[in-house]
Amino acid sequence: MEEVPPEKGEYPDPLEELPRARKEGASEELRRKWRKRFLGLVRIWEQGPWISSGPFGAQVVYADGKVFEIGETTVRFTEPLFHGVEYASPGWVLAIVVEHGGKKFLYSSDLQGPIIEDYAEWIAAEAPDVLVLDGPATYLRGPLQAAATLERAIRNCAEAVRGARARVTILDHHLTREPRFRDACREAFSAGAITGAEALGLPPLTDRLSTWKAKGKLEEMVERARAGELDSHLPSRGLSVDLLGL
Protein backbone atom coordinates (compact mmCIF):
# COMPACT_ATOMS: atom_id res chain seq x y z
CA MET A 1 0.00 0.00 0.00
CA GLU A 2 1.23 3.52 -0.71
CA GLU A 3 0.16 7.10 -0.14
CA VAL A 4 -1.31 9.06 -3.06
CA PRO A 5 -2.76 12.56 -3.47
CA PRO A 6 -6.47 12.90 -2.58
CA GLU A 7 -9.09 12.59 -5.29
CA LYS A 8 -11.44 15.46 -5.97
CA GLY A 9 -14.96 14.78 -4.76
CA GLU A 10 -18.01 15.85 -2.83
CA TYR A 11 -18.68 14.72 0.73
CA PRO A 12 -22.38 15.23 1.44
CA ASP A 13 -23.63 14.94 4.99
CA PRO A 14 -24.63 11.24 5.34
CA LEU A 15 -27.43 12.13 7.73
CA GLU A 16 -29.30 13.80 4.87
CA GLU A 17 -30.13 10.31 3.56
CA LEU A 18 -31.51 9.15 6.93
CA PRO A 19 -34.90 10.86 7.35
CA ARG A 20 -36.08 8.71 10.24
CA ALA A 21 -32.89 9.26 12.21
CA ARG A 22 -33.26 13.00 11.73
CA LYS A 23 -36.83 12.84 13.00
CA GLU A 24 -36.68 10.11 15.66
CA GLY A 25 -33.02 9.91 16.62
CA ALA A 26 -30.63 12.02 18.66
CA SER A 27 -31.45 15.63 19.46
CA GLU A 28 -30.38 18.39 17.10
CA GLU A 29 -28.01 19.65 19.77
CA LEU A 30 -26.21 16.30 19.92
CA ARG A 31 -26.18 15.96 16.15
CA ARG A 32 -24.54 19.39 15.78
CA LYS A 33 -21.88 18.31 18.27
CA TRP A 34 -21.28 14.96 16.58
CA ARG A 35 -21.34 16.46 13.08
CA LYS A 36 -18.05 18.21 13.90
CA ARG A 37 -16.36 14.79 13.72
CA PHE A 38 -17.57 14.34 10.17
CA LEU A 39 -16.52 17.84 9.11
CA GLY A 40 -13.08 17.25 10.61
CA LEU A 41 -12.73 14.05 8.60
CA VAL A 42 -13.81 15.84 5.43
CA ARG A 43 -10.94 18.29 5.89
CA ILE A 44 -8.52 15.38 6.26
CA TRP A 45 -9.92 13.64 3.16
CA GLU A 46 -9.63 16.82 1.12
CA GLN A 47 -6.02 17.42 2.14
CA GLY A 48 -4.85 13.81 1.89
CA PRO A 49 -2.87 11.71 1.58
CA TRP A 50 -5.01 8.73 0.58
CA ILE A 51 -3.99 5.07 0.45
CA SER A 52 -3.85 3.30 -2.91
CA SER A 53 -4.05 -0.44 -3.53
CA GLY A 54 -0.34 -0.29 -4.32
CA PRO A 55 1.31 -3.52 -5.52
CA PHE A 56 -1.91 -5.48 -4.96
CA GLY A 57 -3.48 -3.76 -7.97
CA ALA A 58 -6.63 -5.50 -9.14
CA GLN A 59 -6.50 -7.86 -6.16
CA VAL A 60 -7.77 -5.06 -3.90
CA VAL A 61 -11.15 -3.45 -4.55
CA TYR A 62 -12.84 -0.83 -2.40
CA ALA A 63 -16.27 -2.41 -2.00
CA ASP A 64 -18.30 0.60 -0.81
CA GLY A 65 -21.65 0.54 -2.60
CA LYS A 66 -20.51 -2.04 -5.16
CA VAL A 67 -22.15 -5.20 -6.52
CA PHE A 68 -20.14 -8.27 -7.53
CA GLU A 69 -21.36 -11.17 -9.67
CA ILE A 70 -19.48 -14.38 -8.90
CA GLY A 71 -20.90 -17.21 -10.98
CA GLU A 72 -24.54 -17.48 -9.95
CA THR A 73 -23.96 -15.57 -6.72
CA THR A 74 -24.51 -11.83 -6.24
CA VAL A 75 -22.68 -10.01 -3.45
CA ARG A 76 -23.84 -6.49 -2.60
CA PHE A 77 -22.03 -4.10 -0.31
CA THR A 78 -23.79 -1.08 1.15
CA GLU A 79 -22.50 2.43 1.14
CA PRO A 80 -20.74 3.24 4.44
CA LEU A 81 -23.08 2.97 7.43
CA PHE A 82 -22.53 4.58 10.83
CA HIS A 83 -20.72 2.34 13.32
CA GLY A 84 -23.34 3.12 15.98
CA VAL A 85 -24.95 6.53 16.47
CA GLU A 86 -24.98 9.38 13.98
CA TYR A 87 -21.39 10.39 13.11
CA ALA A 88 -20.10 7.61 15.42
CA SER A 89 -16.49 8.14 16.46
CA PRO A 90 -15.39 4.60 15.39
CA GLY A 91 -16.35 5.56 11.83
CA TRP A 92 -18.27 3.45 9.31
CA VAL A 93 -18.91 -0.15 8.35
CA LEU A 94 -20.30 -1.97 5.31
CA ALA A 95 -23.22 -4.39 5.50
CA ILE A 96 -23.31 -7.27 3.02
CA VAL A 97 -26.14 -8.98 1.15
CA VAL A 98 -25.44 -12.29 -0.60
CA GLU A 99 -28.00 -13.78 -3.02
CA HIS A 100 -27.85 -17.23 -4.60
CA GLY A 101 -30.49 -19.58 -5.93
CA GLY A 102 -33.34 -17.28 -5.00
CA LYS A 103 -32.21 -17.09 -1.37
CA LYS A 104 -30.79 -14.11 0.47
CA PHE A 105 -28.29 -13.75 3.34
CA LEU A 106 -27.78 -10.40 5.10
CA TYR A 107 -24.85 -9.63 7.41
CA SER A 108 -25.36 -6.32 9.18
CA SER A 109 -21.77 -5.79 10.28
CA ASP A 110 -21.24 -3.55 13.32
CA LEU A 111 -24.32 -1.30 13.54
CA GLN A 112 -24.68 -1.68 17.34
CA GLY A 113 -28.34 -2.56 17.20
CA PRO A 114 -28.85 -1.04 14.69
CA ILE A 115 -29.11 2.27 16.49
CA ILE A 116 -30.16 4.12 13.33
CA GLU A 117 -33.88 3.77 12.51
CA ASP A 118 -33.35 3.88 8.75
CA TYR A 119 -30.97 0.90 8.96
CA ALA A 120 -33.60 -1.16 10.78
CA GLU A 121 -36.10 -0.23 8.09
CA TRP A 122 -33.64 -1.21 5.35
CA ILE A 123 -32.96 -4.62 6.94
CA ALA A 124 -36.69 -5.31 7.19
CA ALA A 125 -37.24 -4.25 3.57
CA GLU A 126 -34.49 -6.60 2.35
CA ALA A 127 -36.45 -9.51 3.86
CA PRO A 128 -33.47 -11.92 3.95
CA ASP A 129 -33.88 -15.65 4.44
CA VAL A 130 -30.95 -15.59 6.87
CA LEU A 131 -30.10 -12.52 8.96
CA VAL A 132 -26.96 -12.10 11.06
CA LEU A 133 -27.36 -8.99 13.22
CA ASP A 134 -24.83 -7.67 15.74
CA GLY A 135 -27.39 -6.36 18.25
CA PRO A 136 -27.26 -3.61 20.88
CA ALA A 137 -24.15 -3.13 23.02
CA THR A 138 -25.99 -3.75 26.30
CA TYR A 139 -22.70 -4.32 28.12
CA LEU A 140 -21.88 -0.63 27.64
CA ARG A 141 -24.94 0.56 29.58
CA GLY A 142 -23.96 3.31 31.98
CA PRO A 143 -21.23 5.90 31.42
CA LEU A 144 -20.17 4.48 28.04
CA GLN A 145 -23.64 4.50 26.48
CA ALA A 146 -26.55 6.78 27.31
CA ALA A 147 -29.77 5.08 28.37
CA ALA A 148 -31.66 6.79 25.54
CA THR A 149 -29.18 5.44 22.97
CA LEU A 150 -29.41 1.90 24.34
CA GLU A 151 -33.21 2.02 24.38
CA ARG A 152 -33.13 3.22 20.79
CA ALA A 153 -30.83 0.36 19.77
CA ILE A 154 -33.03 -2.23 21.50
CA ARG A 155 -36.16 -0.83 19.87
CA ASN A 156 -34.63 -0.77 16.38
CA CYS A 157 -33.14 -4.24 16.79
CA ALA A 158 -36.62 -5.59 17.51
CA GLU A 159 -38.01 -3.69 14.51
CA ALA A 160 -35.36 -5.18 12.21
CA VAL A 161 -35.91 -8.75 13.43
CA ARG A 162 -39.70 -8.56 13.35
CA GLY A 163 -39.79 -6.79 10.00
CA ALA A 164 -37.27 -9.03 8.22
CA ARG A 165 -39.15 -12.21 9.20
CA ALA A 166 -36.07 -14.22 8.28
CA ARG A 167 -36.18 -17.99 8.41
CA VAL A 168 -33.08 -17.85 10.61
CA THR A 169 -31.99 -14.78 12.59
CA ILE A 170 -28.70 -14.94 14.49
CA LEU A 171 -28.30 -12.12 16.98
CA ASP A 172 -24.79 -11.95 18.36
CA HIS A 173 -21.49 -10.05 18.68
CA HIS A 174 -22.22 -7.08 20.98
CA LEU A 175 -25.27 -8.58 22.56
CA THR A 176 -23.83 -11.73 24.14
CA ARG A 177 -21.06 -10.01 26.09
CA GLU A 178 -23.06 -9.81 29.33
CA PRO A 179 -25.62 -12.13 30.95
CA ARG A 180 -28.66 -9.80 30.90
CA PHE A 181 -28.89 -9.58 27.12
CA ARG A 182 -31.99 -11.78 26.77
CA ASP A 183 -34.05 -9.62 29.08
CA ALA A 184 -32.87 -6.44 27.35
CA CYS A 185 -33.76 -7.77 23.89
CA ARG A 186 -36.69 -10.01 24.75
CA GLU A 187 -38.78 -8.63 21.86
CA ALA A 188 -36.15 -9.64 19.30
CA PHE A 189 -35.78 -13.11 20.82
CA SER A 190 -39.56 -13.50 21.05
CA ALA A 191 -39.61 -12.83 17.30
CA GLY A 192 -37.43 -15.89 16.74
CA ALA A 193 -33.82 -14.71 17.02
CA ILE A 194 -31.15 -17.05 18.38
CA THR A 195 -27.52 -16.50 19.34
CA GLY A 196 -24.50 -17.71 17.40
CA ALA A 197 -23.76 -20.29 20.09
CA GLU A 198 -27.32 -21.60 19.88
CA ALA A 199 -26.88 -21.99 16.12
CA LEU A 200 -24.12 -24.45 17.06
CA GLY A 201 -26.34 -26.20 19.59
CA LEU A 202 -24.64 -24.62 22.62
CA PRO A 203 -25.73 -22.11 25.28
CA PRO A 204 -24.05 -18.68 24.99
CA LEU A 205 -20.79 -18.38 26.93
CA THR A 206 -22.34 -15.95 29.43
CA ASP A 207 -24.91 -18.65 30.35
CA ARG A 208 -22.21 -21.29 30.63
CA LEU A 209 -20.08 -19.06 32.87
CA SER A 210 -23.04 -18.57 35.21
CA THR A 211 -23.64 -22.33 35.32
CA TRP A 212 -19.98 -23.14 35.97
CA LYS A 213 -19.83 -20.55 38.72
CA ALA A 214 -22.96 -21.95 40.39
CA LYS A 215 -21.45 -25.47 40.29
CA GLY A 216 -18.06 -24.34 41.57
CA LYS A 217 -16.37 -25.25 38.28
CA LEU A 218 -15.49 -21.79 37.00
CA GLU A 219 -11.74 -21.94 37.76
CA GLU A 220 -11.49 -25.42 36.25
CA MET A 221 -13.15 -24.30 33.01
CA VAL A 222 -10.99 -21.17 32.83
CA GLU A 223 -7.89 -23.36 33.08
CA ARG A 224 -9.23 -25.60 30.31
CA ALA A 225 -9.77 -22.53 28.15
CA ARG A 226 -6.20 -21.35 28.80
CA ALA A 227 -4.93 -24.78 27.81
CA GLY A 228 -6.90 -24.66 24.56
CA GLU A 229 -9.09 -27.58 25.62
CA LEU A 230 -12.43 -25.79 25.91
CA ASP A 231 -14.66 -26.15 22.85
CA SER A 232 -11.81 -27.61 20.80
CA HIS A 233 -14.45 -29.64 18.94
CA LEU A 234 -16.22 -26.57 17.56
CA PRO A 235 -14.38 -26.34 14.19
CA SER A 236 -15.84 -29.72 13.22
CA ARG A 237 -19.26 -29.16 14.77
CA GLY A 238 -22.15 -28.60 12.39
CA LEU A 239 -24.83 -25.96 12.76
CA SER A 240 -27.97 -26.93 14.63
CA VAL A 241 -30.03 -24.78 12.24
CA ASP A 242 -30.40 -25.59 8.55
CA LEU A 243 -28.96 -22.75 6.50
CA LEU A 244 -28.15 -24.68 3.35
CA GLY A 245 -31.54 -26.29 2.97
CA LEU A 246 -33.46 -23.05 2.86
Question: Residues of each region from the PLM?
Answer:
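Proline-aspartate-enriched helix->loop->beta-strand connector
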Residues: 127-137, 166
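Short, acidic/turn-prone active-site loops that include or flank metal/cofactor-
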Residues: 135-138, 198-200
